[in-house]
């Protein structure tokens, strides 16, 4: 899930000259000097996940239970499988662009396994269709056993919007392998050796798909999702292995304490070796961190800043546990994961740990503010920042301000302190807001 070097996060040892050529994990792939073919575990794991989801789709569609009284349950399972397959292919395309694509599970004779690359537009169109189908089958979060650890209707809407925005956006294109695609070339980025930055000529159709997905979710009276009024509580709850009471988290990858997951153990607030009775520390910048430059991009009154960026480190100094401050400008800890928010059971295990203990902290793949910001982006692109969308009663600017209101507090003048003077200026405001809202979440 780690996205390597971005404008917000820094991958493990991202600027270390000695790690760029590692091939036995993804550390090399996160490095600034990276060889992109080093991302072996990510490539293998996402393909395995995607193939398993495809197998589930095939099996459910062919299941005799689809013709019984269990049909509604089976359709919900189908919606989950379609969404997970879409997620898998989306991650593959996001990382590697044009990749092999097939709608059916691998055949026993391997006749559909060794296939060539498919252009990303075709893949996007397939998974957009899958997600539209899935939305019709999936229950809302909170219905029966469907909580944030299961794929539900809200996440399918959100993933549809995310995929559509990528599909309609600019990306690197291979004009050598796919010369016949109807694409618009970027006006200011030059072509090089047949590769260019382009987007579909009908890109606005994809923005409309994204807008519809967000608006339909926001306007649905059965929609159970809200923003948690307290930004810090979002992270206290997930660290404490609790589901968010406002259903802010549309989907969490589920882990189990002592069984799986190292979120918080290899990233987050730093607890040095020997601070507890254990010889093993936790937190720090092992998987991902951020930078001092990102910290200073925040408004000082933004409540998200001191939750997202953490400088303290608890270390043994002359035999005494002391709070010190991290001074590396490229190694600021991700504060959304903190050992003192974790469960008592986990902290008791930590007291005697000699090796890493799985924290069980779920990985949040999408939160509800993403819906508001994707709505704002799509509405702005199609209609500008101030025109009101009929289903939601929101303009792009109003949607942005929903997110900023939590960050600064209702009534704060800072809520409207952004440049919305033009479509282009407002787009840049959304880019900045996404960085401040989702920092260290590696999305």
What would you call each of these model-derived segments?
Residues 105-106, 114-117, 171-208, 362-367, ...:
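Acidic, serine/threonine/proline-rich low-complexity intrinsically disordered regions
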Residues 17-96, 111-148, 335-366, 371-374, ...:
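Conserved, well-structured interaction surfaces
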Residues 382, 396-443:
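C-terminal structured "cap/appendage" subdomains that terminate the fold
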Residues 92-94, 100-102, 249-253, 365, ...:
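Structural recognition of the beta-strand scaffold that forms the well-ordered cores
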Residues 1-24, 97-99, 103, 124, ...:
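An aromatic- and glycine-enriched ligand-binding surface/loop that stacks and positions planar moieties
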Residues 76, 83, 98, 151-158, ...:
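Extracellular structured ligand-interaction cores
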Residues 110, 232-258, 338, 344-349, ...:
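Carbohydrate-binding/catalytic loop surfaces
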């Amino acid at each position: 899930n780690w996205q390597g070097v971005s404008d917000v996060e820094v991958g493990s040892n991202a600027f270390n000259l000695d790690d760029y050529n590692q091939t036995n994990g993804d550390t090399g792939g996160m490095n600034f000097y990276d060889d992109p073919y080093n991302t072996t575990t990510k490539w293998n794991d996402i393909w395995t996940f995607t193939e398993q989801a495809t197998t589930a789709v095939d099996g459910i569609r062919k299941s005799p239970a689809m013709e019984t009284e269990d049909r509604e349950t089976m359709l919900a399972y189908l919606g989950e499988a379609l969404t997970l397959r879409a997620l898998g292919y989306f991650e593959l395309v996001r990382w590697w662009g044009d990749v092999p694509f097939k709608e059916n599970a691998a055949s026993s004779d391997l006749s559909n396994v060794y296939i060539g690359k498919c252009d990303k537009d075709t893949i996007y169109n397939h998974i957009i269709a899958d997600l539209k189908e899935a939305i019709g089958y999936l229950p809302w979060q909170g219905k029966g056993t469907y909580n944030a650890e299961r794929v539900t209707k809200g996440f399918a809407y959100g993933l549809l919007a995310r995929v559509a925005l990528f599909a309609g956006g600019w990306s690197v294109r291979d004009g050598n392998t796919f010369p016949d695609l109807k694409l618009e070339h970027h006006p200011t980025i030059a072509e090089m050796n047949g590769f260019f930055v382009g987007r579909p000529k009908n890109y606005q159709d994809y923005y409309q798909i994204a807008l519809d997905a967000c608006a339909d979710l926001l306007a649905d009276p059965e929609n159970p999702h809200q923003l948690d009024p307290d930004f810090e509580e979002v992270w206290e709850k997930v660290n404490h292995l609790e589901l968010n009471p406002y259903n802010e988290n549309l989907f969490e990858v589920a882990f189990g304490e002592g069984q799986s997951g190292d979120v918080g153990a290899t990233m987050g607030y730093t607890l040095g070796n020997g601070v507890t009775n254990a010889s093993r520390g936790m937190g720090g910048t092992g998987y991902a961190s951020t930078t001092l430059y990102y910290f200073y991009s925040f408004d000082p009154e933004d409540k998200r800043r001191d939750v997202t960026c953490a400088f303290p480190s608890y270390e043994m100094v002359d035999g005494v546990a002391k709070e010190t401050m991290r001074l590396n400008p490229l190694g600021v800890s991700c504060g959304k994961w903190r050992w003192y928010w974790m469960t008592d059971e986990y902290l008791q295990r930590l007291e005697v740990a000699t090796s890493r203990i799985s924290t069980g902290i779920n990985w949040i793949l999408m939160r509800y503010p993403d819906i508001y910001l994707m709505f704002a982006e799509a509405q702005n692109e199609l209609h500008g920042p101030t025109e009101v969308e009929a289903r939601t009663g929101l303009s792009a600017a109003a949607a942005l301000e929903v997110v900023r209101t939590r960050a600064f507090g209702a009534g704060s003048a800072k809520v409207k302190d952004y440049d919305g003077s033009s479509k282009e200026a407002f787009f840049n405001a959304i880019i900045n807001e996404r960085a401040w809202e989702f920092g260290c979440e590696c999305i």
